[in-house]
Amino acid sequence: MLKVKIVRLNKQAFLPVYATAHAAGMDVSACLEEPVVVEPFSTALIPAGFAIELPIGYEMQLRPRSGLALRSMITLANSPATIDADYRGEVKVILINHGPQPFTVNNGDRIAQMVVARVEEVSFEEVSELGETVRGDGGFGHTGTVRS
């Protein structure tokens, strides 16, 4: 199991936890002095109250919680959000309200999930052309919407 250092920056912060034994992501909770209202079609930056030190070669992704998206149309504005291994500041979540009603975030509300993953460093080789494939440059819906 990978060990990741974590610092609780606020005594009321909830540290990330796996909700079930085989969950891929850990729940991230809001760390707030007072509730924050995310107005319709607006964003809010919500602190999590902790900072992490990832090993080199890893990243942390913040992702939406499906239940929030389904019930309240709340998701992450930059999904997935990447926390790099050299970042040492407080983890914060950019929530966006796609719904028509204001949404209130309270201290301790589970607002996102985080997944720690390996990252492969790459170098680019500039070439004059790329190898051919059946797909070629087809993209953005080129395969249609109906399964045959």
Curated annotation (Swiss-Prot):
Gene Ontology process terms (BP): dUMP biosynthetic process; dUTP catabolic process
Keywords of this entry: Hydrolase, Magnesium, Metal-binding, Nucleotide metabolism
CDD domains in alphabetical order: trimeric_dUTPase
Enzyme nomenclature, EC number: 3.6.1.23
Cofactor: Mg(2+)
GO MF annotations, alphabetized: dUTP diphosphatase activity; magnesium ion binding
Pfam family, any one: dUTPase
Keyword Methyltransferase belongs to the record: no
Pathway info: Pyrimidine metabolism; dUMP biosynthesis; dUMP from dCTP (dUTP route): step 2/2
InterPro entries: dUTPase (IPR008181), dUTPase-like (IPR029054), dUTPase-like_sf (IPR036157), dUTPase_trimeric (IPR033704)
Enzymatic reactions: dUTP + H2O = dUMP + diphosphate + H(+)
Signal peptide span: none
Transferase as UniProt keyword: no
Residues annotated as binding substrate: 65-67, 78, 82-84, 92
Gene3D superfamilies: 2.70.40.10
Name of the top EC class for this enzyme: hydrolase
HAMAP family according to UniProt: dUTPase_bact (MF_00116)
Annotated family: Belongs to the dUTPase family.
Function: This enzyme is involved in nucleotide metabolism: it produces dUMP, the immediate precursor of thymidine nucleotides and it decreases the intracellular concentration of dUTP so that uracil cannot be incorporated into DNA.
Protein name: Deoxyuridine 5'-triphosphate nucleotidohydrolase
Name of the coding gene: dut
